[in-house]
Amino acid sequence: MAETQTLNFGPEWLRALAGGVGSSIVASPPLSPALPKYKLADYRYGREEMLALYVKDNMIPVDLHDKEFLPILQEEPLPPLALVPFTEEEQRNFSMSVNSAAVLRLTGRGGGTVAGAPRGRSSSRGRGRGRGDGFYQRSFDDVEGGFGRGGREMHRSQSWEERGDRRFEKPGRKDPDGAPAHFPLNHIRANYEDPAAVNARKFIHAECDNWRTTRDELNGEEDDNGWRLAGARRENERWCPPSPDGPRSAGWREHPDQRRRFGFGDEERSGYRRPRSGSGSAEEERDSLPEWCLEDAEEETGTFDSSGAFLSLKVRALEKAPKEPILEEAELDFRPLEENDEYAEKDDSETEQTKDTDTNTRHESDRNEENCKSEEPSPVAVPFSAVVTPPKATTPAPIQPVHLEKAEDKERPSERTTLPEIRHELSKAPLHTALSNSIVEAISIPHVANKLPDLPVPAPSVLPVKSVPPQSQQVKPIEMPVSVPPALLRSTGSVGPISRPSALPSDLDEDEGLKHFEQEAEKMVAYLQDGGVDDERLASKIGPKPSALPITNEAAFKWFYKDPQGEIQGPFNNQEMSEWFQAGYFTMTLQVKRGCDEMFQPLGEMIKLWGRVPFTPGPTLPPILGDADQERMKRQQEINALNMYQLQQMQYQYLLRQQYALQQKVLNSAPPPPPPPQQQLNLLLHQALKIRTPEPQQSLLPPVTRSMSVPDSGSVWEMQNPSTQASCSPNMQPAAPSTWEGSSVWDLPLDNMPQASSIEQLQLEKAKALKLEMERREAELRAKREEEERKRLEEALRARQEEERKRLEEEELARRKQEEALKRQREQEEAQRRKKEEEERLAQEEALRRLEERRREEEERRQREEFLRKQQEEERRKQEELEAQRRREEEKRLEEEAAAAAAALLRQQQEEQKKREQEAQRQQELQRQRQQQQEALRRLQQQQQQQQLAQMKLPSSSKWGQQSTTANSLSQSQNALSLAEIQKLEEERERQTREEQRRQQQELQRVQQQQPQTKLPGWGSVAKQPMATKSLLEIQREEAQQMKQRKDQQQQQQQQQQPPPQPQPQQHSTNTQQNRTQNRAAINTSVWGSVNNVSSNWMMDSSVWGDTQNSNIGFWDEAVKEAAPPQTTRKSHTPKNKGNANLSNSSSGKASKKVEEEEKLLKLFQGANKNQDGFMQWCEQTLHTLNTANNLDVPTFASFLKEVDSPYEVHDYVRAYLGDTPQAKDFAKQFLERRAKQNDNQQKPQQGQQQKQQESVWGIREVPQSVLLQQQQQQQLQQQQQQRFETVTSGKKKKKQKMVRADPSLLGFSVNASSERLNMGEIETVEDF
């Protein structure tokens, strides 16, 4: 039982995975380790499911685009092996029996491995087929089915077991109810051109291919015991596949009448012959099966269907309904074909009666054959004979089958591949039938006989009529050459045989025989209709005649084809047809046409006509119009010839039966009947000619069809007259009834004719024979003429087709040349376009490069210009520094020269002082006169000051202007003090200055200790340094001290200048110059001091605001300390005053303007000090209530608004910051009124305080009229402005006055120029020097 392991179910890898668990009911280990058992997979998929999962257009996954996968990545996916045609080696592998190959390989006997390893399938009997270990590369000769060698196609979707019953069957007719089959690619006809394909097959099989017998011998079992004997010798048909008429079966378990007939070795080799019997019961079938496949086994067994599901055999045995075929398998039913398996199915339409009758005959012939005869495949015997039993024979002679099929099989491929002339020759070849009293000896084809040297039956030629003595009991065979059309030879089992009645009564009814012959004629004509569709198809469906579609129809240029069942399929586009053609589904004989064509043509003819595969892209041909009349005429000729042949045969058979009946009557001593009336023959002829086929449909055959006419050589009538022999044996008994075993319509049994003894009978027969001979000759002449006419028409048609083909080839050549020219032109245009694009791209790159270079050059140029500009700026700055240094040196030199001049003047003054002391007395005398002059001068100065004040328009709150004017007026009216008093005052002033400096230093140190981290950055940080803010009272007190000091100096000067009397104009000019000098000194000692205040110790100078050089008093202090007499002082001052006169005159206007601006700034500064009086408190409270938007710094805005003089500007600022509301307008009006009152209240105490100060220093002095006048004018001016504002407020838009400059400390830098830099600040002229 170990050998049966080769029939395990499932693929090999599944059995190996299973490890023996549940994969087989046999517990014994397998014979070879090469067939291990595996565990079954949890999920199994059928072929259709796996193919459905394959999508050709799927994109490559993104993960596989990595660089590491590039060497092994293939752009185009490999198609599934089910869609790839087999190579020749794979076809040879598939044509072998897997059981035989596996057993022979395991036992080491013969059957070496084939050259090509199995591809994409398991070597053992596994259903599933994987791709195998390696990767598959198509060889260069693995092409699709073409004209020459076309490999036999098999359906890749089926493994050996799935194919099971249909492994070797011919692609026969399908079940009409099932899905229409696709294309059986039986390219085996083309394989006959390749002798290697034929010879290679016989070396594959071992000496004995009956593997069951081989195993029996190995196991030492007897030939006559066990199921193996039954399987090998007895009921071999049990193992045959079922009939293709039914659906696919599962194997042995089907009932015998559901099984397909299949001779496993009948047509393949003589060593393994299988009878064609379908008899036998279920019990016998069980006896002939191995025990491991019986249903009473221990475990449940079954098979796997195409979806991978397990099917129990018990369940399947209970189901009597046949399983429906899988749709795709039904549509794509490709099966392997042996060289001689064209006729594996012969008696598809036989009745059960015929099947049963030839069973015994087949069994006897099988027993006479040896099992393993030779390696070569022997010719296959098919019963083609008419068995005739002699009259007195007790047992029938042994049947010698006629070996015809091999020759016919070889004849057919040549018909398919050669020109129509060869077909005509084949159809003309006579078939000689030797008729004897026991058997039809042989049927052969003479011109094919040389190909079959091993035929056991000779091919006799036509023999002349021999006379045999009447005493001879041995009847010589009657040789009758019969010409059988190839279609009849090819379909011997297609037409049901005529079964004669078992007993032939002596009074045979002639009408019955005539009716019988008419039925046979009808069958023959019906076969001709069917055979015209396909020589191998007997019951094909003939579709309607195709008609051409108009060009405008969308399906006009789509493709239609006729499937093997004769049905028209379509329309399909070019892409679908091309894919099917490349997949190998189409044979060269497939009938195809476009929608616009009128007729179908074979694909091979279409390819020749088009010059290419018509489905591929290219120019299309005009619609092909069918030559329907010619086809119809040819077909009619064939039918006429066949009808004539039928008529002759029917007449001959009828005459034979008449003679036989006549002889029986003569033997029964009956009077001879009259000859058959001419009316009966005419009626028979009329009825035979009335059987006409309708106009034949257009068939799937090529346009040139085979001839069905009667051949030239060999005549039906060239036969021995039966009456000659009948007359020699008058003593013979009537013939026993015999069964007719022939497979042709005309192989009717001819019973032995009793010999007539009467001379009249012989004469009558001779006359009839002469008449028949004449009719026969006329029929032959007519047939010859028709044959010649047909040949001529065929020749003309062939010539026309050749011309058409040449024309199409020339057109195709011209079209190809035109296409090549167009292709070259397109390539040139493409090259020019690419060249132009390349030039454009280069030009763009060049332009970009130039643009980049230009941009880079521009950047470099800009950098160079920037560098040059910086260099020029640096050089200019250096030049300015050099110029400033030169000017400083020049100033220093001038100062030194001035010091030298001052020293010289001092010496001169000392000398002159002595002279003045001498003249002092004289001056006292003149003092009274000089006082008068001074009084006039004071009045003149008052007028000048009033004019200046009118120009300056000082506000009422400016204290310094009043004080300076007061000081000037006082200095002129004071009496000269003594020198000791002046020195005391000077010492007192110096002491106060030192105390003030010491106090300022202490404050500065304290501030620096509080802010030790404060840096001294540039000029922008000056405003951020802490200011030693003083109250208004302190500032006024210090200013009063300065004014007192100036008055002291002026008194000293007056005392020095009083003794020498001078003319009045000179004194006037001197005093004017002194006053201007003093004014300029006062300007220098203004509130803000000089620019040197930027330094951190700006409060360490001698004055209140820190003039660094103390230029206002340095010169006069020295003069005072010299204590020179008055005369020298006046003399020494005269040149100096002259030198400074122009300078004072030119700068007086500027000084007054600067004093005015500085006073305004000081007002703003005082407001920043937040002198919180009642007016300011009211102002801030009101602003807080009005500041609803919370966007105003109230203290700063109040102090700023307080210093704005113009009522217009006050209203503008209030409107801008507080909004144009009634509350804001009311606030502005109240603000102006309160400010005016406060200014009046502030001016009165200040005037009183000034009077007190003047009284404390100089005694009680009256306030100068100019000061009072100025104050009055200012008050009047403010009142006028207020009134003017009130009157104009209701008018139109106000004109803004000039805005007051802000405190420079708020800006963070000083607006005054440095005193060390020239050309900055005031404009100086040459006259200033």
UniProtKB/Swiss-Prot annotation:
Biological process (GO), any one: insulin-like growth factor receptor signaling pathway
Chain segments annotated as transmembrane: none
CDD domains, alphabetized: GYF
Record's compositionally biased regions (Polar residues): 720-732, 954-966, 1068-1081
Domain GYF span(s) in chain numbering: 556-604
InterPro entries named in the record: GRB10-interact_GYF, GYF, GYF-like_dom_sf
A family per Pfam: GYF
Composition bias, Low complexity: 377-397, 899-908, 929-951, 967-980, 1002-1013, 1239-1254
Comp. bias intervals (Basic and acidic residues): 150-177, 251-271, 316-338, 352-376, 403-415, 781-896, 909-928, 983-1001, 1035-1049
Gene3D superfamilies in UniProt: 3.30.1490.40
PROSITE patterns: GYF (PS50829)
Highest taxon above the source species: Eukaryota
UniProt biased composition (Acidic residues): 293-302, 339-351
GO cellular component annotations of the record: cytosol; membrane; perikaryon; proximal dendrite; vesicle
SUPFAM superfamilies: GYF domain
Phenotype caused by lack of the gene: Morpholino knockdown show mild, intermediate, and severe phenotypes. Embryos with severe phenotype display a disrupted body pattern, embryos with intermediate phenotype show defects in the head and eye structures, while embryos with mild phenotype only show a twist in the terminal part of the tail. Embryos do not show important cell loss in diencephalic dopaminergic (DA) neuron clusters.
Spans annotated as Disordered: 109-184, 236-419, 720-740, 781-1081, 1122-1155, 1236-1256, 1279-1302
SUBUNIT field: Component of the 4EHP-GYF2 complex.
Known role: Key component of the 4EHP-GYF2 complex, a multiprotein complex that acts as a repressor of translation initiation. In association with EIF4E2, assists ribosome-associated quality control (RQC) by sequestering the mRNA cap, blocking ribosome initiation and decreasing the translational load on problematic messages.
Similarity comment: Belongs to the GIGYF family.
Name this protein carries in UniProt: GRB10-interacting GYF protein 2
Organism of this sequence: Danio rerio
Taxonomic lineage from the root: Eukaryota, Metazoa, Chordata, Craniata, Vertebrata
Gene this chain is encoded by: gigyf2
